Amino acid sequence: MIELDKRNREIKQEVEALRAERNKISKMIGGLMKQGKKEEAEEAKKKVTANAETVERLSAEEKEVEEKIKTIMMTIPNIIDPSVPIGKDDSENVEVQKYGEPVVPDFEIPYHTDIMERFNGIDLTSAGKVAGNGFYYLMGDIARIHSAVISYARDFMINRGFTYCIPPFMIRSNVVTGVMSFAEMDAMMYKIEGEDLYLIGTSEHSMIGKFIDTITPEEELPKTLTSYSPCFRKEKGAHGIEERGVYRIHQFEKQEMIVVCKPEESPMWFDKLWQNTVDLFRSLDIPVRTLECCSGDLADLKVKSVDVEAWSPRQKKYFEVGSCSNLGDAQARRLGIRVSGPDGKYLAHTLNNTVVAPPRMLIAFLENNLQEDGSVRIPEALRPYMGGMEAIIPSK
């Protein structure tokens, strides 16, 4: 990186000197022609031509060097917050707090797809024929719960002062590289063939992209948005696609939240964001805990991150249902998201958090609300979105 930067500076100096020399020679040519010194003028013209060719070659090299610099810069990770625990991977994340009492009932809890099948609520076989592994059909009461959770989450966030947004479900490459690292992009994003467009892996990307190349007055901050969207992911990472179930899949829906704010306010907003997710899950009677992500589990652009995990009575452990991240000014720097204040312009901070991703929520919801008779209790907060139903009854 340093060597390329040095060469880039050298090229710029060379080009500047050559252009100054060309201007000087060009002025001389006119004088030589007036003096009738045609041979000297022709020699000067040859120097101008050679000069222009050298400038063209150096300019091409400059462009190539700057592209290499940009590529390397995109791989340089953010500076993590001093409070982040040091660790090699997610096995060294640190539990922060538990909310709600984890319960393991006296009766056996089946795998989540087995519960869904009792309600004729899922068809993985047909989805496999239509789209392959990593897709599903949800039907009947299970599909209703899915939609009810999304609607409830939307209203939950609106009541907390967030502006509801339905964003584009495709974004251009400059937005993709503005919000994530190349490694994340390769593992997650589906590209539209023949187009400079990618299917979003999360609506955070298109919501943050809304502020590309903007300058927002301080008094208009923070910008707080919550959105619903389908999400599409290749899931090429270490975990891959789940062979059976809806925990890790190619297509799912999600309610997301983002904040664009002043740098000094981002720690406060970080805590508010993950607390929103905790409060939503607790309002649906699902025990959760928060984990502080260690340094080895942070994506390149993240300054600090907290995972929210829900209790699984079947597995007798917690599993991830959402992630809250403070990106500092990393995304703002790449996308040109600036703020104007009394002392001039500066980069904003951006944050994002999962409100709820219903496929994973469904797992926690069904396991924590399953009754011994096979019915699934509908928590009181969700009943208005389920036509007043207090429970769903299995059909088999």
Regions found by a protein language model. Give the residues of each.
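TRNA-recognition modules of translation machinery and tRNA-sensing kinases, especially anticodon-binding
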Residues: 98-396
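N-terminal alpha-helical targeting/anchoring segments
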Residues: 1-102, 117, 121
